[in-house]
A protein has these predicted regions:
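N-terminal signal peptide c-region/cleavage motif recognized by signal peptidases
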Residues: 14-16
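C-terminal partner/receptor-binding element of secreted or periplasmic proteins
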Residues: 83-119
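Short, linear, compositionally biased motifs with a strong N-terminal bias
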Residues: 10-11
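Sec-dependent signal peptide recognition
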Residues: 2-7
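N-terminal secretory signal peptides
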Residues: 19-67
Length: 119
């Protein structure tokens, strides 16, 4: 597990979109928005803590099935992943996600908040 140090300010609301890991302490259902990491499409949702994000490989993508959790720990972030997607593509996405800045995270949080719910 690697730590991704980011300093950000956050505020969002929740709207249902898609199911996320039931073991996660937060609900991560705001959004989603679609982004590309590691050359593959990902659905990004923000969590009820207003600071954490979940990246789910889009169904049919080469990284699927896989999920990354960017979890706010109080002072910084933990980036963890799990699933059975193609390792080449999940590793490439992981490398891209490690490069996210505080501004990038804030932009993603704001974009998920602004996303229209997918019914």
């Amino acid at each position: 597990m690697r730590r991704v140090a980011l300093a950000v300010l956050f505020a969002l609301t929740a709207t249902p979109a898609f199911a996320i890991d039931a073991n996660a302490p937060e609900q991560c259902i705001t959004g989603p928005i679609e982004k590309t990491y590691g050359g593959t499409p990902w659905l990004v949702a923000s969590c009820s803590d207003g600071k954490s994000l979940v990246f789910v490989a889009k169904e049919g993508g080469k990284a699927a099935p896989f999920e990354f959790d960017l979890t706010f720990t109080g002072n910084d972030y933990d980036l963890t992943g799990h699933g059975k997607g193609d390792r080449k593509f999940t590793d490439a996405a992981y490398a891209d996600l490690q490069k996210l800045t505080g501004k990038d995270v804030l932009d993603l949080l704001n974009a998920t908040k602004a996303a229209k719910p997918k019914n």
